[in-house]
Amino acid sequence: MVEAGAKISKGGTQQAAGHGLEGYASDGSTDLRSAGAAEHETQDSAKAQENEASANSMDDGLELGRRGQGVSPVLTPPTEEEGDAPAQKNRRQRLKERKATAAAAGALPGIGRARSGSVKEGGSPKAAGAESPRRGAGAAAKDAKISERAEGAGSPQQRKQGTGAAAPGSPPRRRLEAAEPPATPPRRKQAEGEQSRPEGEQGRPENKNKKAKDKHDDLPTRGPGTRRPQVRAVPPPLSEELKNEAFRKTLERVETVAPEVPLQAAEQRSEPSDFDLIINRLRVNAQEYMSQDEQAQENLQEGVRQLKSSYTEFLQTIQPEEKKKGDVEELDEEEEEMRKIDWQFWTSVVNNFATVAKNDSAKLEEKVSDGIPKQIRGIIWQLISNSKSKEIRQLYQDLLQIPSEHEKAIQRDISRTKFIPVDKTESLFNVLKAYSLFDPEVGYTQGMAFVTAPLLINVWEEADAFGLLIKLMKNYGLREFFLPDMPGLQLKLYEFDRLLEENSPQLYNHLIRLGIRSSMYATQWFLTLFAYKFPLGFVLRILDVIFVEGIESLLKFAVILMLKNESVLVQLKFDKLLDFLKDGLFNYYLKENVRKRQEGKEDTNAIQNAEVSDSSSKSSTVGSEILGVEYNINVFIQDAIREVKITPIQLRRYSSEYEEIHQLEFQREAQYEEMRIKNRQLQREVRKLEHDYTLLNREHIMLANELIQNRLKIETLNDENKDLKLTVDVLKRHLSDEMRKQTLPNPDAQIPTDLKEDLEKTMQRNLEVMNQNQELEDKVTALERQVKQLKKNRANTSVEHGEDSSSEPRVRSHIVTPSISSWTFKKPW
């Protein structure tokens, strides 16, 4: 519910209940008088008592009061007693006690009732004050102010002066009797001679510019040397206030339960583990130990006793030798190192590592930076990490009997691990195989052999190396480096970038400008614990720090490499810079370079070193893996420990930033994925709709063609129908004519006369044509006879004249003879 309602401070409520109305005007109360407060005040005491039950049934967490200017209600802040956690009580019970006390004193029902006595209609508030000797001039002024405020009349000036006419017919307000006067601020007496405004002018402000002032007319006025005390009015009973609709709406928005204190407020107390990686790692290991069951804790305790026993046996073997060789002046290098070891300190570490870490973490860090003695390195590692347990031993034996799907990959990567002794190759395979079965989610990933090999070299049994690997993976957080998405590696790279930005902003900005990200060169640092580049002794020293401070110490080694090469890195461009980051970055800690710096012969040609890093780094890598003496391990570890300061609280801040960024990216990626899914769905729907549209379009075209054809058929049929109708009409007419003819007595009578004349003319013409035709035929016959006669005469002539006549040209003569015969007419019919 939104802020609303009003509050009565704790002290003011108790005073109102035990001492009367005057104690109710405390600084913590708030005025919530509604516009109909005057009408509420006219209710008699019997009606107030009748509604007391409804007032008591309201939420006990609300304490309502009012301030004179009628401001918006607010939530009641906890008082000092309520905010004190050790003395805090149930608020409901406390309020019930207050109500019981108020009911016993007769105060609760009468908070909003009229006072005993009366103010005569139109009378002055001073008259009412004169009726009660307890009430002074200040009380009378307050009554006048209450009456004026109830009516909503009077100018701001009159309200300040405490004058005004009382509402006609309104009963006077009764003040609760108190055993002793409460400590209330003094009230300003009404000045003599002040007159109230006429009734008709009440409610009209004197000036529009005073509206803002009217809202705060009850606040104390500040003048030179004077200060008006704040006077608060008494609200009506809650049951009366509930009748006002505006009050009820405001009450609905009130949050009845006080807001809880944020968790961060209770966790602001700093602890040593927030500023020390060693103590933080101790705390994490202790929490991991306490999270296990009793049987597992007993097994771990048994493992600790075995480790302490092994350490004691080792001390017994070296102490007699030290006594015998104490007088020998010349000792070999190994014996000299043994004499320099602070065995007393390491004994205290073995006996109680937690005490040493808490009380003397600085010395522990110094000793670890110098290196854990190699004779007891495995014991110290197992003691710090609580890794030795017969339960893990039994689990390891069981896992060895199960085949793994990663065996081929493990065999392939073991051949690349050159610093592992030959006799440890099979043990390394067994440990990696067992872990791939123990953690199927991780299985086996390239680079795990670089982490497991140093563990295996410093313990006596494979099961111990398996236990150390489990602790590094699960408890130290190395497992997250090898998960499919590598969340731990991504976080460490982000923390590395933030640390580099804080320690060397110039170098960080230079890399960012060139577009070089830490994932391009620092991934192998964290995955292999620098084992891919540094020799075995180097990796063992790094593991010493990791077991004591946690996997976070890798950030120190990564940052110190960047800081020491900053002068070279800021001068290189992209290609050479990336090559230098991958290979030439480690040349700073070559023993030769360290010796030159210590002798004051600093190598000034750093850029040349970066240019030849491609060729020289490869040879130095091979030499470091074989000899292990090229790098100065002590200087590297000490520089990282001393110059790079990292606190757990700082890393938690980076982690929170990364989680926030990752969450935003995850949400953005989820939105993108959701949009891609929706896009694919929409594309499928579009293709489906397009296919459906194509089918519908084809059907539409087919239907359109059919429609056109049908329309053509209809038109054709209509034409045929018309023709048939015409034919029917003609046939009908013929039929009617024939039927009419059959009904007539003489059929020829109906032949028209003109037709007969035409027929006669036609017959006459036909006769003429036939005559002409006969004549022509006769002529043709005559001509044919003439031709025959001529041919016969020619033949006779040629015989008579012989050869002479043969040479003469032939002359055709056509003799036309009249026709002997004549034409005759035949009757045509």
UniProtKB/Swiss-Prot annotation:
Keyword Nuclease: no
Pfam families: RabGap-TBC_2 (PF23436)
GO BP terms, alphabetized: endoplasmic reticulum to Golgi vesicle-mediated transport; exocytosis; protein transport
Keyword line: Coiled coil, Cytoplasm, ER-Golgi transport, Exocytosis, GTPase activation, Protein transport, Transport
Domain Rab-GAP TBC as annotated: residue spans: 371-550
GO MF annotation list: GTPase activator activity
Key word Transport present: yes
InterPro entries recorded: Rab-GAP-TBC_dom, Rab-GAP_TBC_sf, Rab_GAP_TBC_domain
Family under the similarity heading: Belongs to the GYP5 family.
Protein's recorded name: GTPase-activating protein GYP5
Organism: Eremothecium gossypii (strain ATCC 10895 / CBS 109.51 / FGSC 9923 / NRRL Y-1056)
Lineage: Eukaryota, Fungi, Dikarya, Ascomycota, Saccharomycotina
Gene it is expressed from: GYP5
